[in-house]
Regions:
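Surface-exposed acidic, glycine-flexible loop patches that form ligand/cofactor-binding
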Residues: 42-44, 107
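A structural-propensity feature for long, helix-poor, extended segments
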Residues: 45-84, 88, 92-95
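C-terminal regulatory domains involved in ligand/effector binding and gene-expression control
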Residues: 74, 79-191
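Conserved phosphate/anionic-ligand binding catalytic regions in large, soluble enzymes, centered on
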Residues: 13-31
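Short glycine/serine- and small hydrophobic-enriched flexible loop segments
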Residues: 29-39
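Generic hydrophobic, aliphatic-rich segments that mediate packing or membrane embedding
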Residues: 30, 67-68, 130
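Terminal domain-start leader segments
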Residues: 2, 39-41
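Short, hydrophobic/aliphatic alpha-helical segments
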Residues: 2-16, 52-53
Length: 191
């Protein structure tokens, strides 16, 4: 069975914080997703510390592509498409000077960047070259949750081990395509 994913032009061309959809938008979405997962599992208020580990190309180019900043902002619950750009620098200064961040903007935890945000430049996770691992600990440093995410391009992320679920579209897309050539052919035919 072939599962097709419907994409809009708005999925392909996005407004969001940069400079990179794979190295900035994706990691911010992954960090926010992990914080939301903690909340969904009822673990947010028991979380005393979170660590984020970057692998592969995220680790190699992370600081230059603002991946470190994206992780901090995502853990705070910010989203690349709705973030107030004027809030970025004050939030980062607060986190870095206090060595604390607010998970989802409301649960304050310790976060010492050199200890809690690690760049593994010589390692790659098995699922993709843009891999991240997030771990939440309680006050006794017991692991509450650990998840791996992959930034697969365009700001899209997948969580390792999460099964892909086919979503039934409410309506058939007007122009299905499997390649760039087919997309261009639809464009030419429609004018």
């Amino acid at each position: 069975m072939v599962v097709r994913m419907s994409l809009s032009v708005f999925d392909i061309f996005k407004i969001g914080i940069g400079p990179s959809s794979s190295h900035t938008m994706g990691p911010m979405n992954a960090a926010r997703s992990f914080a939301e997962l903690l909340e969904t599992r009822g673990l947010l208020t028991n979380t005393a510390q979170v660590s984020a580990q970057l692998y592969g190309s995220l680790a190699l180019t992370g600081r230059g592509h603002c991946t470190d900043r994206a992780i901090l902002l995502g853990l705070e619950g910010m989203s690349p498409d709705t973030i107030d750009s004027a809030a970025v620098e004050p939030a980062l200064q607060r986190i870095r000077s206090a060595k604390r961040l607010r998970l989802l903007g409301r649960h304050e935890i310790d976060f010492d960047e050199p200890l809690n945000l690690l760049f593994h430049t010589d390692q790659v996770l098995p699922g993709h070259s843009n891999g991240m691992r997030f771990t939440a600990h309680d006050a006794a440093l017991n692991v509450l949750a650990r998840e791996e995410y992959y930034s697969i391009g365009g700001g899209f992320v997948i969580r390792a081990g999460a099964e892909a679920h086919a979503v039934t579209a409410r309506h058939q897309p007007p122009f299905e395509f499997d390649s760039g050539a087919q997309l261009l052919a639809h464009g030419r035919a429609q004018g």
